[in-house]
């Protein structure tokens, strides 16, 4: 189909909706199995909320900069195993301690369970041996990117661990996207309006009243005091408009923002087509921005 980046080749067979309510348990099981197989070889820690954290350390005693990186999965599924290669690269190439936390999923565990799990992981990381607490970044992919943005807001508001930088890859930021006119589903891949609405409905099912910014960062009233950011998204991503708008709001508030827009890229492109030149360039830019912010 025309309109997708040519580096991705034929995308006709890529699903428009990677997960459905009826297949959610299967996806969770398969990712948990993969996580068990890979996680046995990774250092593990446990947060104050009893959630496991995968830990990747660079060579040397430190103190090292650190990255708390949250996996994607639409707030309803996922596992650190999908971020294993990226975490190893960051530890080796940037010399940072990388923490991949697990967190609660909707609809069984709605807001604020997931973000509180992320906050507990941030507190653990700030106090971890070999970590320089003045050089901590938060980031994530998709739902993890949205949680990272929410975490920066929560840490600011609570006076919690200092965050130097936020690295937001195609973040899931705005619950109001489910109420807007849906784009043509033929123009997107992996994540579409139907599953997005179902995921947000489950995540926010216990919210009574206005949706807080720590649930949906696009509801943020006052950006002042948030850390500088690198924010990236594809133009064929359902989240494109909300991500672009959020980056613009941060920049308008005087927060340094590097907004990277990939023409013709769909949601999940950097994982699904990781060998495409445009994907490699995108990930290289992410890592370069992280290195510059932390070192």
Regions found by a protein language model. Name each.
Residues 52-63, 218-223:
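Short beta-strand-to-loop junctions in surface cap/lid or active-site-entrance loops
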Residues 79-80, 86-87, 99-135, 273-279:
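Catalytic nucleophile-loop/oxyanion-hole region of alpha/beta-hydrolase
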Residues 1-58, 295:
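A glycine/proline-hinged amphipathic helix-loop "lid/cap" segment
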């Amino acid at each position: 189909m025309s309109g997708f980046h040519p580096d991705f080749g034929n995308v006709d067979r890529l699903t428009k909706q990677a997960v459905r309510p009826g297949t959610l348990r299967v996806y969770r099981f398969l990712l948990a199995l993969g996580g068990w197989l890979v996680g046995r070889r990774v250092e593990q820690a446990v947060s104050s909320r009893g959630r496991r954290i995968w830990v990747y350390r660079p060579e040397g005693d430190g103190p090292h900069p650190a990255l708390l990186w949250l996996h994607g999965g639409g707030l309803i599924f996922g596992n650190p195993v999908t971020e294993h290669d990226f975490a190893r690269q960051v530890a080796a190439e940037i010399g940072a301690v990388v923490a991949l936390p697990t967190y609660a999923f909707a609809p069984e565990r709605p807001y604020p369970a997931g973000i509180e799990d992320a906050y507990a992981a941030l507190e653990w990381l700030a106090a971890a041996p070999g970590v320089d607490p003045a050089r901590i970044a938060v980031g994530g992919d998709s739902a993890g990117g949205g949680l990272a943005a929410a975490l920066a807001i929560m840490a600011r508001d609570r006076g919690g661990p200092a965050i130097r930088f936020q690295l937001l890859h195609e973040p899931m930021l705005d619950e109001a996207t489910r109420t807007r006119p849906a784009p043509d589903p033929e123009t997107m891949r992996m994540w579409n309006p139907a599953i997005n609405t179902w995921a947000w409905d489950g995540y926010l099912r216990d919210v009574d009243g206005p949706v807080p910014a720590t649930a949906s960062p696009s509801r943020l009233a006052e950006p002042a005091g948030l850390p500088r950011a690198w924010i990236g998204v594809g133009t064929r991503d359902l989240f494109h408009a909300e991500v672009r708008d959020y980056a613009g709001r941060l920049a308008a508030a005087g927060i340094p923002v590097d907004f990277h827009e990939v023409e013709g890229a769909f949601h999940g492109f950097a994982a699904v087509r990781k060998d495409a030149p445009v994907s490699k360039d995108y990930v290289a830019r992410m890592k370069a921005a992280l290195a510059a912010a932390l070192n």
